[in-house]
Swiss-Prot record:
Enzyme class: transferase
InterPro entries to which the protein is assigned, alphabetical: KsgA/Erm, rRNA_Ade_diMease-like_C, rRNA_Ade_Mease_Trfase_CS, rRNA_Ade_methylase_Trfase_N, rRNA_adenine_dimethylase, SAM-dependent_MTases_sf
UniProt-recorded name of the protein: Ribosomal RNA small subunit methyltransferase A
Family matches, as Gene3D superfamilies: Ribosomal RNA adenine dimethylase-like, domain 2, Vaccinia Virus protein VP39
HAMAP family: 16SrRNA_methyltr_A
The entry's keywords: Cytoplasm, Methyltransferase, RNA-binding, rRNA processing, S-adenosyl-L-methionine, Transferase
Record EC number: 2.1.1.182
Length: 273
């Protein structure tokens, strides 16, 4: 039997589809999400409704975003979920979550078993809507969760770590083996909770500057910042901020990156390119 077929649906590689089918894992995720009636719950990539059904059972209304037209059609005719669902057959990568929160009159609670081939760019898309999001629970490749939660001085620490922790409190929830899916992915998975900061611990004047600095630093992560960011900061400026120019990108904390971004923004030293 083709192990890419689950409940009569052929998993599509181009959509990165792996369907969750382990009841213990499903129950654990739903318990972590803890959906409540009256909340603006939004699922990205409901697939064959492994999470949609148990979450939907607890709710009067549930919004889902599903790119695959066949799966969206199945949900429309679902025996008990159908009437509760608002289905957007759209790409989550271009979806306007701010408009949806405005329409629903409250911040969104977003969850999903995300396609691993788009998980990182989708995270960055969602970060731009954190003022419209109450919290997020996602199943991701374990390596991506490790990067989201990583601190300085570790190999996993990178641009994703800095930007995620700038916007959110990031909490690992549970690890999930490949056997919990059909077809089984070639990697381990994990569930993570991201809660946007109510008050930014390290506010920056222009987040585009922070994004630019972290991109340049981590694109040359083996170099010291004296070299990788030498076009933006002199040794004297770095030292004046209490940042050792001999450090590499992975040694610099989120707070220090924010400090550097604010220096550039305050002094109008970064030209858009």
């Amino acid at each position: 039997m083709n192990n890419r077929v689950h409940q009569g649906h052929l998993a599509r590689k181009r959509f990165g589809q792996n369907f969750l089918n382990d009841q213990f894992v499903i129950d654990s995720i739903v318990s972590a999400i803890n959906p409540q009636k009256g909340q603006a719950m939004v699922e990205i990539g409901p697939g064959l409704a492994a999470l949609t059904e148990p979450v939907g059972e607890r709710l009067d209304k549930l919004t889902v975003i599903e790119l695959d037209r066949d799966l969206a059609a199945r949900l429309q005719t679902h025996p008990f979920l159908g009437p509760k669902l608002t289905i957007y057959q759209q790409d989550a990568m271009t979806f306007n979550f701010g408009e949806l929160a405005e329409k629903m009159g409250q911040p969104l609670r977003v969850f999903g078993n995300l396609p691993y081939n788009i998980s990182t760019p989708l995270m960055f898309h969602l970060f731009s809507y954190t003022d419209a999001i109450a919290d997020m629970h996602f199943m991701l490749q374990k390596e991506v969760v490790n990067r989201l939660v990583a601190g300085p001085n570790s190999k996993a620490y990178g641009r994703l770590s800095v930007m995620a922790q700038y916007y959110c409190n990031v909490i690992p929830v549970l690890e999930v083996p490949p056997s919990a899916f059909t077809p089984p992915p070639k990697v381990d998975s994990a569930v993570v909770r991201l809660v946007p900061h109510a008050t930014m611990p390290h506010p920056v004047k222009d987040v585009r500057v922070l994004s630019r600095i972290t991109t340049e630093a981590f694109n040359q992560r083996r170099k010291t910042i004296r070299n990788s960011l030498g076009n933006l900061f002199s040794v004297e400026v770095l030292t004046g901020m209490g940042i050792d120019p001999a450090m590499r990108a992975e040694n610099i904390s989120v707070a220090q990156y924010c400090q550097m971004a604010n220096y550039l923004a305050e002094n109008a030293l970064l030209q858009e390119s």
